[in-house]
C-alpha cells in the first residue's frame, strides 16, 4: 500500500467536487475552482498505476488468470452502478428521449456502460451522469491483461503511447468546440491513454523505488513536482480546453504521482498521516 497516493486521492477528489460547485454559488465560478476537473485525469492515471501495482506481476506469473481478474474488477463496478441507475430511472433523473423506444435505448446504453461511447450529452450524461467514468474504467480493466506483454518491455508500451498521443493531439486540433466533451472528455477510447500513462509510471516506479534517495532529495523532488503542477494549473486558462481535458495535464500529474509514490520526502510523511489516509 502506498499511503501517499491514497491521501492524494482525497485532495484531487476535493478538486473535482469544487469544479462542480459553480452551479451552487457563483463564488466557485472562477478558473481556480472550475479547473478542478484535472482530478479526473489524475484518477485515470492513478488507476493505471494502481492496477499495474496490484496485478501486473500476478497476471504475468499466472498467479491469477484473465477471467479471475475481470470478474474481480467488474464485480466492483456493476452492483452499485445498477442500483444507482434504477434509482435514477425511477426518480426520472436527467434523460432526454423522444419516446419509449428512445428511452429504452438510453437505458440500455447506461445499463451496459456503453453510454459514454456515444458522443451525445443526452447519452453520456443520461440517468446517473457520473457513470461515464465507469465506462472508462470498464474498458481499462478489459484491456489491461492484454497490455502485460507490452509492459514487460516498457519501451514497447511507450512507443504505443507516443503514437496514440500524436494522433490525439492532431484529432483534438480539428474537433469542433461543441463536440469536445463527447469525443475527448468522457469517451473511454480517448481516455485510455491516461490509463497507459499510469502503467508507464509504474514501470518507472519499479526502477526507482529502491534508489538511495535522501529525505532532503525526496523533499526537493516533491516540492518541484508541486510547483510544476501549480504552474500548469494556474496558467491553464491560456490553453484550449480540448487539450486541458486530457493531454495537457499528463506531465504534471505524472510527475506528482511518481514523486509521491516514492515516499521519500517531508510531504510524503505528512500525506502518510493516518487521518489523511483514512479520509
Identify the function of each model-found stretch.
Residues 2-3, 28-40, 122-136, 175-197, ...:
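Interfacial loop-to-helix transition and helix-capping segments at the boundaries
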Residues 14-22, 90, 116, 163-175, ...:
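Aromatic-anchored segments of alpha-helical transmembrane domains
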Residues 37-40, 44, 57-93, 101-110, ...:
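Transmembrane alpha-helical segments and their boundary/interface "anchor" motifs
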Residues 49-57, 84, 88, 140, ...:
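Hydrophobic transmembrane alpha-helices
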Residues 94, 195, 221-279:
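Alpha-helical transmembrane segments of multi-pass integral membrane proteins
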Residues 138-166, 202-221:
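Solvent-exposed interhelical
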